[in-house]
Amino acid sequence: IAALIGIIVCGVLYTFVTNIAIDKRVVSTYFGNIAFAYEDYGLPYCFSASLFNTGISEPNGYTKKAMAKIDKDGELNQTATSRSSDELPNIIVVQLESYFDVANAEFFTTSEDACPNLHNLYQNYSNGYFKVPSVGAGTANTEFEVLTGMNLRYFGPGEYPYKTYSKKHPTESAATALASLGYGTHALHDNTGNFYSRANVFNNMGFDTFTSKEFMNVLQTTENGWAKDEILTHHIMEAMDTTKQEDFVFTVSVQGHGNYPETQVIENPKIKVEGIEDEALKNKWEYYVNQVYEMDQFVGDLIKAVEERNEPSVVVFYGDHLPTMGLKAEDLKSRYLYNTNYVIWDNIGLQKHDKNIPAYQLMSEVLNRLDIHSGTVFNYHQQRKGTKNYLSDLELLQYDILYGKQYVYNGKAPITEGHMVMGIRNVSLSSIVPQLNSGYSLYGE
């Protein structure tokens, strides 16, 4: 009994001290990088915070009346555009793994431009810094913000909503918003389909198809085993060829993924890094920069392929987070570890308008420029961004949609179940051959 009382007392004291620390901002309730958080705040706080504090807590003032005021009598659920069906463009969004413009690094130089295609796009199309919710990791959280328009700061510390919510529950997204206008919706990823539970998540987000690595004939890989992004261009075009209407294609690349080797593994690197004295660190950055160069070649190839289709199109590129390299704010021109880069290419004459934007506002920004108003959260951003109580009302809206009573849906949720299929081709199994030691090989077409 004494031991139990001691545990209870310790728990109460821990909770009391923790709440004071949070109130005084000694510790944070938001983890942009879970590994860094463990270093900064220690095991007990980080473990308990990430284990027990998930989802969005009910905000003060959450009532049906408050949500009606935010919704403005159903305005957030409307779908509208001035464009005819022939004028609606294809929308391709490409998430570049661990990408940022290496010209923004201040502690090394490169023997030649590592991303000439992207630099050309920056000069001619809308671009800026892209504020992401994590640093050095957390790809799926940037995806979540982009696809849903929701701000990760209202979730638990270090939480991945892909794992805690969207893999189990239907979730309104850019796919459902554009499907309501007749778009075909496709997701692609040159890594395995179950990574971050994407197969379940994309199904619950309303995508029509998901083509993952298992449905690609990956022949080219990096020195540390990740698929090279050059394979994505063909599969993006193939996905668009499966429909007669306009398409929304959300593409997640993987080539820039860590770990980055401390030994020189590229025999004759196209790009050499200068200015770093530590040999191991130089090798890591030289490897990374050469992956960025090849990712940039993929960007150029994709733009060329889209141009050759001669269809109205918009292509968005952005980096999901900085690479895991121990970067510090003073290493970067932006002086901010949560900035990558984005650019919006188009062939429909959109005006160049440079600005810095957070990940959760990206799709609402793109859709607004296209005069497309669809999706509850995207409509909210378009109507309320920059107004009084914008962020506090966004928290209420996110809670209502995910964990509340869904007042804003008025009984008509945009998605109640998924319908996605894996891949875009019919797959048949012709034989199963047992291996000598264990397992089986599956053959088919």
Predicted segments, located by residue:
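N-terminal secretory/membrane-targeting segments
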Residues: 1-89, 110-129, 164-168, 172, ...
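Solvent-exposed soluble domains appended to multi-pass membrane proteins
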Residues: 76-87, 95-96, 101-445
